[in-house]
Swiss-Prot record:
The keyword Zinc applies. The gene is metG. This is Methionine--tRNA ligase. PANTHER family: METHIONINE--TRNA LIGASE, METHIONINE--TRNA LIGASE, CYTOPLASMIC. GO terms for cellular component: cytosol. The lineage of its organism: Bacteria, Pseudomonadati, Pseudomonadota, Betaproteobacteria, Nitrosomonadales.
Length: 706
């Protein structure tokens, strides 16, 4: 096996607030992938850091009467506590306010300047005459210049979705002091992203080497423009004093913008790890590095990671990312996380209420599919799925069999002829087990597919144990060998399932390692043609007495969690600092909502025949910018539908998915062929989406939606 050398990062949480369940989507996703790679025997380093610079940190520290350094030290300890509580195993968790990050920020800036990619220009900004500071976009409020909505921020309107500059706001005021800002001119430093060297490189990088998911590559194509077109703008990388950050070398009162040194924090954190562990930093970051570099991020910061970051690295003489993996936002019960509803749940409150962090790790894994789709934490489904899958299916296998092994057979599994008979049973009943499929799903970050495959296998094990009924056999003393085989089989299959679930459930896996009397659960690879029975525990293996591994979720625990967050947020809510976080990934953003359409009668509605459809095939449509051609199975027949969802979905990701279609819509002759219906998708008034609708589990092709 070829050993891969891999460096993995998660986006840096901002040092201006608590970790919440939206943030945890990314860190759990990354941690699962890293643990899987380490189980494969690869050399993997996982680094992260607090993103510590910027005006919000400076102002919050001032408000609390402490230094910014004291604030970020306190928040760093809180963040690390929360991550540790959810078993996020960083190899290094650091801070961007470090000598290492400063060194690489200055080095990259110097090299870009030497390459002629730094420009100095005078810009006009809004200035707070009371606080004596230039106001970032999110620190200015006023009336939207497009629709007139009040209390809008200086960069975009949450009512109509319009984008604008702070100087365009009507009746602006400072969100810091309440003063009316004045206009002042200041020299700023720009990274010349529009330079042909950057634009040409980004165009090549986007389309070569599979660096981005298909949805991200489509978004990059929009930002870059068509071939021969350059839609990129130069990037302002400086801020004026007063500011908490790194001063630009050779300048007075000019600081690096937080988004310049934030991704450089990956390098700073890894450099710290290298110093601790004796790792060769250059082997991972030099231009011709053969190692692998992966960034896990939220889709709302794709712009910074897929445009600015690779262009900076390339032109400063460093390697660029192997791949950037972007995930979607988290909603709770189908809605944006809400403080008033108690669904803006912090990591700390989840743990303080006594909820098992591995319940959430499993639920997120069951939802994450490697795409940029949003995921929903439906709290009722959360309770049902964890109780059904983890406790009812998986843990139940061990609890049904372990007691007999300990009490009747001294903790020893079968050996000799009975072991050979057990192997035959395994190969006969579980021929459909495909560890390679699970492995491929983990590699592709399609954890939902891995979980589905594992739980199907757990169902098969439970079905066989139910058929063998060891609790019935145990009543007949003449069937001791049969009882021993049945219970040994259950423990053996539980062992294999535990190997596959270890990246998701590391704490439970550690308990199982003790229960099964193992040094460490390792990934059980099954070679082509090799029987599954070759991957079992050896004959006569001795296990320890069974200790309870996991409890069910009591719905009352969820109610208590919601109540606790409602009470806490009412006491500590600080919307001013919360809204200024430059990395708001993991939480769905505010969006304008279209007005409700004209009322129709029930008679009108029932004319629409909505059916569950399985996407059998999905293809690009030559010459079409927005369309995908879908082949849909609606139970009784197959239909061809052209859907305008190309910007959001890669065809390969759609195959096998269920969706909803209008089945009785008149066929429409299009330039590319006949469209025999319409699939349903949601989209925002400000351009968000489209988001293909999907039914709940259990729905089948052809079922009518009513």
């Amino acid at each position: 096996m070829t050993i891969r050398n891999i460096l993995v990062t998660s986006a840096l949480p901002y040092a201006n607030g608590s970790i919440h369940l939206g943030h945890l989507v990314e860190y759990i996703q990354t941690d699962i992938w890293v643990r899987f790679q380490k189980m494969q025997g690869h050399t993997v380093y996982y680094v992260c850091a607090d993103d510590t610079h910027g005006t919000p940190v400076m102002l919050r520290a001032e408000k609390e009467g402490i230094s910014p350094e004291a604030l970020i030290a306190r928040v760093h300890a809180e963040h690390l506590r929360d991550f540790t509580g959810f078993h996020i195993a960083f190899d290094q968790y650091y801070s961007t306010h470090s000598d290492e990050t400063r060194y690489y920020a200055e080095d990259i800036y110097r090299k870009l300047k030497e390459a002629g990619l730094i420009a100095v220009r005078a810009i006009e900004q809004l200035y707070d005459p009371i606080k004596n500071l230039f106001l970032p976009d999110r620190f200015v409020k006023g009336e939207c210049p497009k629709c007139g909505a009040a209390e809008q921020y200086g960069d975009s309107c949450e009512a109509c979705g319009a984008a604008y500059t702070p100087t365009e706001l009507k009746n602006p005021y400072s969100a810091v002091s309440g003063a009316t800002p004045v206009r002042k001119t200041s020299e700023h430093f720009f990274f010349k992203l529009s330079d042909s060297r950057c634009a040409d490189f980004l165009r090549r990088w986007t389309h070569e080497g599979n660096h981005l998911q298909a949805e991200a590559a489509n978004k990059m194509a929009e930002w870059l423009g068509e071939a021969g077109e350059n839609k990129l703008s130069d990037w302002d990388i400086s801020r004026d004093a007063p500011y908490f950050g790194f001063e630009i070398p050779g300048e007075t009162g000019k600081y690096f913008y937080v988004w310049l040194d934030a991704p450089i924090g990956y390098m700073g954190s890894f450099k710290k790890l290298c110093a601790r562990k004796g790792i060769d930093f250059d082997a991972y970051w030099k231009k011709d590095s053969t190692t692998e570099l992966y960034h896990f991020i939220g889709k709302d910061i794709l712009y910074f990671h897929a445009l600015f970051w690779p262009a900076m690295l390339e032109n400063a003489g460093y390697r660029t990312p192997t791949q950037i993996f972007a995930h979607g936002f988290l909603t709770v019960n189908g809605e944006k996380m809400s403080k008033s509803r108690g669904t803006f749940i912090t990591a700390e409150s989840y743990l303080e209420q006594g909820l098992n962090p591995e319940w959430l790790r499993y639920y997120y894994a069951a939802k994450l599919n490697g795409s940029m789709e949003d995921i929903d934490l439906n709290l009722d489904d959360f309770v049902a799925r964890v109780n059904s899958d983890l406790v009812g299916k998986y843990i139940n296998i061990a609890s049904r069999c372990a007691g007999f092994i300990s009490k009747r057979f001294g903790g020893k599994l079968v050996s000799g002829e009975d072991y050979r008979l057990l192997q035959q049973m395994v190969d006969e009943h579980f021929a459909g087990w495909q560890p390679g499929v699970i492995e491929a799903a983990y590699e592709a970050r399609d954890f939902s597919a891995a979980v589905r495959h594992i739980m199907r296998r757990a169902d098969e094990v439970n079905e066989l144990i139910h058929e063998l009924a060891p609790w019935e056999i145990a009543r007949d003393e003449t069937r001791e060998r049969e009882l021993h085989r049945a219970c040994s089989l259950g423990i053996q299959m539980f062992y294999l399932l535990s190997c596959y679930l270890k990246p998701i459930l590391p704490r439970t896996a550690a308990q199982i390692e003790d229960f099964l009397n193992l040094g460490e659960l390792s990934w059980q690879k099954q070679q082509a043609g090799q029987p599954l029975s070759d991957t079992l525990l050896p004959p006569g293996h001795v296990i320890n007495p069974y200790q309870h591994l996991m409890t069910r979720i009591d719905p009352k625990q969820i109610t208590a969690l919601i109540t606790a967050n409602q009470q806490t947020m009412q006491q500590t809510m600080n919307t001013e600092t919360e809204s200024h976080s430059p990395q708001r990934h993991g939480q769905a953003q505010q969006h304008p909502v279209a007005p409700i359409a004209e009322t129709i009668s029930i008679e009108d509605f029932v004319k629409i025949d909505l059916r569950i459809a399985r996407i059998v095939d999905a293809q690009h449509v030559p010459g079409a910018d927005k369309l995908l051609q879908l082949t849909l199975d609606i139970g009784s027949e197959q239909r061809t539908v052209f859907a305008g969802i190309k910007s959001a979905y890669d065809p390969e990701q759609l195959k096998g998915r269920l969706t909803v279609m209008v089945a009785n819509l008149a066929p429409r002759k299009m330039k590319f062929g006949l469209s025999e219906g319409m699939v349903l998708a949601a989209s925002g008034e400000n351009g968000g989406g489209p988001f293909l609708l999907a039914p709940d589990s259990g729905a089948q092709p052809g079922m009518r939606v009513k």
